């Protein structure tokens, strides 16, 4: 600091700079802007530590009195550092006290925001948001809150969005709504076909392939039911009149009787053993 004092008889004042090392001047200048609570000056060790984080911003001050005979200016360096250096200053100030006045080693670690792993921060963020798959140790945390519905796809068409999941051949809720309805219809149709085939085989019905162009194929088919057969030539089912009896007799292999002998017909005599007697 610059000390002002008046000489005894001259009546003029002189500015005398206090002699000292550059470190003392920097310490006193730093104490001017950042006074300590107990009134003491800033420790030189703290000034040296803060100088390591200095961003080289300077402030030039002029003498306080305009009538001063001194024409020079004093350059004092202020520690207006970055947030990382501001965080490191309390640690650097507390380190000598913890070491009982011993100098701080050069490799003393400082707390800095730059040392924070952005990968760890990003992994913790994405694990909470479930925006991307996490790797490493964050897989367990991401897998705990993972929803299996997000990875579900239809086994038939491969879609992932459907209003309703239906059961399919690959298990429950393996088909989308449209594919599940189609699969259900085909399953019912196949079951109905199997039931019809089983009923026809139980009655002993055997379908014979008829020859093309044969007369038997042109005949009127009989109405076949399970266990009985009704002829199309019987009118009224059973117990009614028989239509086309001659054709029915021929069908039953019955030969009709011969015509009745007239009165003029002569029956021949039979030859016997007593014919010549």
From Swiss-Prot:
Residue numbers spanned by region Disordered: 52-94
Presence of the UniProt keyword Transferase in the record: no
Organism this protein belongs to: Oryza sativa subsp. indica
Protein family membership: Belongs to the type IV zinc-finger family. Class B subfamily.
Zinc finger (GATA-type): 154-179
Physiological role: Probable transcription factor that regulates organogenesis during transition from the vegetative to the reproductive phase. Regulates the expression of CYP78A11/PLA1, HD3A and MADS1 during reproductive development in rice. May act upstream of CYP78A11/PLA1 during panicle development. Acts independently of the photoperiodic and gibberellin signaling pathways.
Protein name: GATA transcription factor 15
Low complexity bias spans: 58-74
Any single GO BP term: regulation of timing of transition from vegetative to reproductive phase
Alphabetical list of Pfam families matching this protein: GATA
Top-rank taxon: Eukaryota
UniProt cross-references to InterPro entries, sorted A to Z: Znf_GATA, Znf_NHR/GATA
UniProt entry keywords in alphabetical sequence: DNA-binding, Flowering, Metal-binding, Transcription, Transcription regulation, Zinc, Zinc-finger
Gene name of the record: GATA15
SUPFAM superfamilies: Glucocorticoid receptor-like (DNA-binding domain)
Record has Protein biosynthesis as a keyword: no
